[in-house]
Amino acid sequence: MSLLRKLPNKSFVHQSIVTARFLTTANAFPDEPTSVYYDDLVNAAGSERDLETVRYLLNKRMRDLCFNTANTFKFITNTENSLSILDDLYKTLARLDKGFTRKSAYDTLIARLCKLRKIDEALRAVDIMAEGEFGLNAGSFHPILSALTRGKKMEDAWRLINLMKQVKISPDLTAYNYLLTAYCFSRNLTAASDVLKKMEEEGLGADARTYDALVLGACKAGKVEEAFVLLRMMVDDGQSGLYSTFAHVNGVLLKMGYYAQAVKFVMVCGGRDIKLDTELFGSLASKLIGLGRFDDAKFILNEMNSRGIKMGHKLRDYYEINVKLTVNSQAKETK
């Protein structure tokens, strides 16, 4: 994980050659290009190992406000032949326009390498950013921390936190949230508590992701009351909460057989956000049907219908056949 590597020098083809290549083809730049359009061109050039064209396109797309995406470096794949281009690609990115253009390219490449689980290669990009002063910040480390914690490589994740400090990059709330979530997911509440202490020492607060991790940990440990306390703290702290946070609570209630409480929980949480309602009510209805709790499911579906909450195709079919049709039949029999 050594930092501060020096970049080798290399002669490059003049940009005019690259420009001519594209402007003389049938695929001339449109008046209003998109990020998808540029991604296709970058990947085509990258697949041909034409890094001068890649450099030209990465510069031009930023001038056209077509920002990099998760697909920008899709030509990098998990094969030896593809990865052999990285040394030259690192050097090519170092010659991009200064500022956001260059930083964004490195950050996007780091994210791509992490998706391929090539952590060492991602760290090489970090080295280059640090050495060249290319805008390295906490965000550059996030994909690496995410990959390490998802892979349960917690010692490596902590080493990366220390590495950030060595290069004078303060780990931010998001960085610690990755660690916190991993520990809570694995039910290691002692380690999670240590992370919280570290966050407090460094003057970091809590955001929706922090509470999501803590609620997850409480639910994984079967501590429902503690999860409810955390939800109240989250609301008092001004955080709206993620869908997954409420899903954690619903999941543990159903797992423990507290079906009535799960229905009540969704009813209490509903009415604040239509997207949240769609996910919460729909998910609960589907799970109740799967558990054979048909009366509870019908109640939730009726609530969804009366509140104008959109149902998925399967839920809509179930509602039309098992709820609405039944109600109509009963009404006719009554008459």
Regions found by a protein language model. Name each.
Residues 1-110, 115-124, 128, 132, ...:
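N-terminal targeting peptides
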Residues 29-30, 65, 97-98, 117, ...:
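Inter-helix linker motif
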Residues 34, 38, 54, 69-74, ...:
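Pentatricopeptide repeat
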Residues 50, 82-85, 118, 153, ...:
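Residues in the short coil linking paired helices within alpha-helical repeat scaffolds
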Residues 57, 88-92, 125, 160, ...:
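Alpha-helical solenoid repeat scaffolds, predominantly canonical TPR units
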Residues 60, 92-95, 128, 163, ...:
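The canonical alpha-helical register within tetratricopeptide repeats
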Residues 212-322, 328-335:
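Structured C-terminal portions of repeat-based eukaryotic scaffold domains
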